[in-house]
Amino acid sequence: MKINFLILTTFIILTSLGFWQLSRLKEKKLFLDSIQSHIISPGINLEKVQENLLYHKVKITGQFLPNKDIYLYGIRLMAMEKDGYYLVTPFKTIADQVILVVRGWFSNRNKNIIMKATNNQIHEIIGVIMPSEKTLSYLPANDIKNNVWLTLDLKEASKALKLNLENFYIIAEGKDISNLDILLPLSLNHLALIKNDHLEYAITWFGLAIFLIVIYVIYRHSSNIPVPVNKQLKSLEQKNNQKN
């Protein structure tokens, strides 16, 4: 009875996980479709987005704040020099919002001259709104002293820059206003290429459930096979011999 209960409980858990992954598959598809529609649409003024800010393509007008750059470490596989940083600068809008903007990527060897990208002219930026990143336990902490960031944690950035930042940041589309050749522009297309692996996960859970039932049926079948008479007699003889 115990093994029957254990098998039944495990089967229910595995199939429940499978159906949960199917539900997540549907949610992720709607999410990715929403991102795709936002990316291909023209940017709208940030002030007109009243709710569900994340992943909207927006326009903001204002200026970059000088001497407040963040260097966010990141590898670009398609670049000639793969090791480098994303240039992240606070942008003060005409509505007095302060928003971190990811402006472009530069190679590690250009770190000492990227400060030339400072530009305090009033201009417009078009980009996609992104959520704050969470610091992961398996990653080293941000090296604020040397300005080497691994995670764009906006609460930590607010404290480090001594600014009241919005709880989202923007990935800018196209070439930066500085027009520096060393600062490579960013593409938003990769946002729509996020993998939706939930179908594979669902198949895995359902497969494990089926495998469990097959093993259980084989076990039950083998335990119900009658022992041949000659083997029973031999077993009795062995027991009698042991007694004697």
UniProtKB/Swiss-Prot annotation:
Main location: membrane
Keyword Cell membrane among UniProt keywords: yes
Residue ranges crossing the lipid bilayer per the database entry: 7-23, 201-219
InterPro entries, per the entry: Surf1/Shy1, Surf1/Surf4
Record key words, sorted: Cell membrane, Membrane, Transmembrane, Transmembrane helix
Similarity annotation: Belongs to the SURF1 family.
Protein name: SURF1-like protein
Species name: Rickettsia prowazekii (strain Madrid E)
Mode of membrane association: Multi-pass membrane protein
KW Cell membrane (keyword) present: yes
Top-rank taxon: Bacteria
Subcellular location: Cell membrane
GO cellular component term of the entry, any: plasma membrane
